[in-house]
Design a protein with these regions (language model features):
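Active-site-flanking alpha-helical
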Residues: 57, 150-151, 184
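GST-like domain detector, emphasizing the conserved glutathione-binding G-site
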Residues: 1-112, 126
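GST-like fold's C-terminal all-alpha helical module
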Residues: 83-178
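Conserved beta-strand edge residues that scaffold enzyme active sites
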Residues: 25-26, 143, 188
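A generic structural-conservation signal
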Residues: 21, 138, 163, 183-184
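Terminal-tail/helix-coil boundary detector
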Residues: 180-189
Length: 189
């Protein structure tokens, strides 16, 4: 159910990369943080999901997902980074409380603050999506992988949510992609 693992699996399917998934202690030990995902490509070991996304797109020359033109690439990378630094940070507490039911996240004030910040982030995304079909323009890019999974978490979390029509339309567009149905909109928040 890890959003970070699902990012990598979704990207592999979009790019057409064959992979073997291994969920064992030796693989987790390759990451000094003890977390997944960890990618092993021959003798090269890489961890951090968004870095893995970029590596795969670069290695497989998936320029439709990660453009080479500097401003187009920067737009994609900005949204990838925004997902990791702003969007994830906003939803982490509320999601841990409301979906994972983690007792370490039971402070109602923090839950409400996280929900408010999360809603604000979805509003930022909704505004961007009123101008484009996807987050970095009118074509699906690598940025839509982490953002799409975060949007899935938004819709799967049991809480009151204001209407964000552009985000809803985006979620429906992503749902036309088989890899998103496998790794995103699959009943797993």
């Amino acid at each position: 159910s890890s959003i970070n693992v699902r990012k990598v699996l979704w990207a592999c399917e979009e790019i057409g990369i064959a992979y073997t998934r291994e969920d064992s202690a030796p693989e987790m030990a390759l990451n000094p943080n003890g977390l997944v995902p960890v990618m092993v490509d021959r003798d090269f070991v890489l961890w951090e999901s968004n870095t893995i996304l970029r590596y795969l797109a670069n290695k497989w020359r998936a320029t439709s997902l990660l453009p080479t033109e500097p401003s187009a690439r920067a737009e994609v990378e900005r949204w990838i980074d925004w997902q990791a630094t702003e969007f994830n940070t906003a939803w982490r507490y509320a999601f841990s409380a409301l979906v994972r039911r983690n007792p370490a996240f039971d402070d109602s004030r923090w839950i409400e603050a996280s929900k408010a910040d999360w809603t604000r982030m979805v509003g930022i995304l909704d505004d961007a999506l009123t101008r484009h079909l996807y987050v970095a323009g009118d074509s699906f890019t690598l940025a839509d992988v982490p953002i799409g999974l975060s949007v899935n978490r938004w819709f799967m979390t049991p809480m009151d949510q204001p209407s964000f029509p552009a985000v809803t339309a985006y979620y429906d567009r992503l749902s036309r992609r088989p890899a998103f149905l496998t790794h995103g909109r699959n009943g797993i928040p």
